[in-house]
Amino acid sequence: KVIGKALRSECHSGSKILHPVVHLHVMNPRKLLYLQKRPETKLIQPGKWDTAVGGHIAFGEDVKTALQREAYEEIGLKDFSAKPIGNYLFESDIEREMVYSFVSYDYKSINLHSDEVTEGKFWSQKQIEQNLGKGVFTPNFELEYVNQLRDRLF
């Protein structure tokens, strides 16, 4: 139940205000998972590989609308279909998120045109497994991969 709204800066200030976010994982037919590299200028986890799409749900916005908006803003995807993977609570030293996670196989129209993403590429399960725990990925991606994606997508 939503009980109010807060600025992104408040949510990421260490206040641990629980806030909703969407994640979209994009797979291709070869079972490769598309990840995006966060810019070095990001406050949280700069330069690390992360979920293809991730972003805050705006106050009054529904999950589906947020997913479509964030996918377009970050990787240029629009009018795609997505299946729910699940929801989970993520907590770090500075934030607490309710994550709504989805997967899409509509990968052909990925078009990076955002200052939110440095680069993107498809990763095999083996490549992901070899890099877990080495500081290559964001902690949130690693948690989601181990608890949700590993057994459901690969």
For each feature predicted by the language model, list its residue ranges.
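Nudix hydrolase/Nudix homology domain
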Residues: 47, 59, 84-88, 93-105, ...
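Short hydrophobic alpha-helix segments
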Residues: 5-6, 37, 88
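The catalytic Nudix box helix
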Residues: 34-35, 52-84
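Recognition helices and adjacent regulatory flanks at domain boundaries
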Residues: 42, 69-70, 100
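Short loop/turn microsegments at loop-to-beta-strand junctions
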Residues: 21-22, 62, 118
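A glycine-rich, hydrophobic loop/mini-helix early in the fold
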Residues: 21-53
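A short local loop/turn or secondary-structure capping micro-motif enriched for an aromatic residue
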Residues: 11-14, 41-45, 120-121
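Acidic, metal-coordinating catalytic segment for phosphate/diphosphate chemistry
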Residues: 1-23, 27-29
